[in-house]
Swiss-Prot record:
Protein name: Exo-beta-D-glucosaminidase
SUBUNIT field: Monomer.
Residues cleaved off as propeptide: 19-26
Chief localization: secreted
Transcription regulation among keywords: no
Keywords: Carbohydrate metabolism, Chitin degradation, Glycoprotein, Glycosidase, Hydrolase, Polysaccharide degradation, Secreted, Signal
Amino acid sequence: MIAKAVAALLLGSGLASAAGTPLTSKAGDKVPIPDWDLKSSSEVSKDLKGLSKPGVDTSAWYHAGTSKCTLMACLLNAGIYKDEDLWYSDNLNHFNWGQFSIPWLYRHEFALAPAKGKHFILQTNGITSKADLFFNGQQIADSEYQAGAYAGRTYDITSLAAKDNAFVVQVHPTDYLYDFALGYVDWNPYPPDNGTGIWRDITVKETGSVSMGPISVVVDIDVPVESSPAKVTIRAEAQNLENVAVVLDAEAVVSGNSCSGGPLKQTVKLAPGEKKLVEFTKTIAKPKIWWPKQWGDQPLYNAKVTFSVNKAVSDTAQTNFGVRKVTSFVNQYNDTQYSVNGHPFQVVGGGYGADMFLRWDGDRFTRIVEYMLDMHQNTIRLEGKMEHPELYEICDKYGLMVMPGWECCDKWEAWAYNDELAIFPPPVWDDNDYQTANYSMIHEASMLQPHPSVLTFLVGSDFWPNDEAVVLYVNALKNAGWQTPIIASASKRGFPALLGPGGMKMDGPYDWVPPNYWYDTEPSEDRLGAAFGFGSELGAGVGTPELGSLKRFLSQSDLNDLWKNPNKNLYHMSTNVSSFYNRKIYNQGLFKRYGAPTSLDDYLLKAQMMDYEATRAQYEGFSSLWTASRPATGNIYWMLNNAWPSLHWNQFGYYMHPAGSYFGTKVGSRIEHVAYNYQKKEVWVINHSLDQTGPRKVDIELIDTNGKQIAKQSVNINTKANSGFKAADISSQIGKLSSVAFLRLILSDSKGNVLSRNVYWVTNSIDKLDWDSSTWYYTQVTSFVDYTPLNKLSAAQISVTTGSSRRVAGVPGTQTRTVTLENKPSVPAVFIRLTLVDKSGNDVNPVSWTDNYVTLWPKEKLQLEVGGWDASGDSIQVSGRNIAATTVKL
């Protein structure tokens, strides 16, 4: 094993320099290598030491103008391939995968300014999944040492550094079953390169005699946090890089939110090569508390640490942090329940999908966070896709909690007791694997620790780590100052004694189930994913894109297959060996419940109704039963988004278009809400807030498909913060229905302000589930409800008027318009779909609607708002179940 490593992990900040200008300019600078030349090893010299000397001609190599990219991402960046070509139809299935079956080389030349007393540290943060490193003609690491996609390593290159420098990284082909990588399991087809390459920045850091490790910030505060002081401990490891003793002057400054007091100082003596943890403690008497978005503000403090030797800066770094407290416990039902700042916290979220080629786009992720908050989600789960520091900075800023953790179904869970891998017996870990896993956890813990948005860490997903691995994981986390719950796994298959039960269930579903599934909770031992306990990944598998997106990645033949061949395997689903390679289960429900589609447009509108009712019911079920006798403590929808354009498993499409699954989620997760329990035919009131209490009114009305009133009542209640409770039993009214009817629920406050408006299409029966025949991914329906009368609705006529454009503060370029819908006839206008388009008729994405896919009562008027992140919106396309499609100019 070859390595010239510095034990400390170094973090900091800096800006890349132009060619010929030294990459770093002063102590404390930490600069990513800005771009790469790359080439297959079959096309270059085998003399890698020679290739790592300055002056090599790389004019025939590919050039990627980005600091980080897997092989595929680099080639896309270089213009060799295009997304629209790769994504179209099944083109990816015909790609030349073989070119990545051998090593590839990354190369970059850069300048430095070596001088006495200067040190240069090269740090890897993420290479998938193993590599040989060469610098200025010398090998500094082999692929046994530089192994693991998350195993950040540091290398002291001071003795090799020169004015002109060359660096070569030889990456080896990744095998998910044998390497610690970033796999996709059955989420989507595997990328042709299996994610091989430099997917995170490789940085060069300049220091003086003493280098600084990552800063951690330990915050101790009692509840109630609102009236308690916070003890803040700032920690960073100092390492003497000299062969003589040095005296270190260390200083820390805490700032932000009117934080008072001067610098914290201390002097530290370091023997040659010695490492020592330097700690500073400060008490903030009246701290500003960081809250999840739905509960409050997100004030951030800053901690800056500076190491000086002989009155000259040797190293410096800073990090933001927040004052908050996260705990968890496993209740009497073996379910995990979180608490944030002393308040029970129901996890409401989705499972994140990284880009198939691991390309990071901070602006795109910001839009994703804004979408999640618009859907009233509070948590995002990252299964093995921990991305980059910027992700957590964005979540800190916006108030979205994060559940990072290791992934399932590959080398990360190659335990002797794991009988579910694609290979048997499992390729169990050897000594080097444990070392790789240890360095992976050390690196990720140091990156994650200061961020207040981090809710927890899952050291296992489908299976729990063995005793040897869990000790490494827990020690690495604790040594980093970890303060949030460490969870053994996202399932209840087992657990290590050191951590105890994980308290999360992974019992499905992953494919379509009807809305009443979530409310059918008894007996709970047989009800799998229904709304009780903590569901770490579950959902009805929905997420059908609308036509504007579908045309971007499907051929006409593919589009025809959607509705003409309902059982056909489809490339834009999961992998071809998974249980999710077709829409058979989903389409059975659609055809049986809504009737066979008569066209692609008819299929897509029915699909949006299916998707809308599916996600709405899931979130309403968990929210309603949050304070039940066996509480529904958490719910992660599988999945939030996709790695590529997909036909299922998302709350919004790859092209950022929000459709039925999005608005079903948004309605079902409202902070104050009123919902229909399909199983018991009851009306429930939901309150996710901490402070919104007092009198409320629930208006309940049933009408038939012709608009005739069947029943109407109002219920006055007092809402309870952070709870769900029954407001009314309407089983007698529902039981008398002879056909499909529409149920409208309106929740209002004491001033008459509408807090939630919610419309269902219902019958006197529900879909019948055969729980005894359940599989790991769905529960069979033996009898379906009949919504086919919706195909014979009388035509409604609506008017659509738009208000003047206005700017939204804090969002540059955003345009917002009011859109008023009025249903003039005496029949309901059902499932009205509104799509913002540009002058060419293409979808404007991302886009924000206060509501969409709405159903209007006869003579009802409803005002909505639409906002886009640019000014390209030109008109609104309007369609629905029983209205004529039209386009309204803005």
